Amino acid sequence: MAAGKLGTGKAAATVLHEDELVIAIRDIAPRAPTHILLIPRRHIPSALHLADADGPLLGRLFAVAADLARSEGIADAGYRLVANVGRWGGQSVDHLHVHLMGGRAFEWPPG
């Protein structure tokens, strides 16, 4: 996922939602039958860079996730929301994003 390329038109992704705060796209390398990335429009390197003032952004991001889970038909069975932080946390892109995954059962703890 190339979050930095979204605004340039160079990222090959299916956009599912756009508003002034959040963009949601289908992951180009899905790890579940439904795998969507929710990305803040404003550049935030990771969750470590969030502040109290980002509350409205996070509220919007989670509301969009819930709306997409319903529209994708995965809300009732359940889904997973994941934000990877740092190298050991699995973060591979230097832009905060949340994975919405569903359509199959997940194990705990994750790999």
Residue ranges and their predicted role:
Residues 1-111:
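HIT superfamily nucleotide-processing domains
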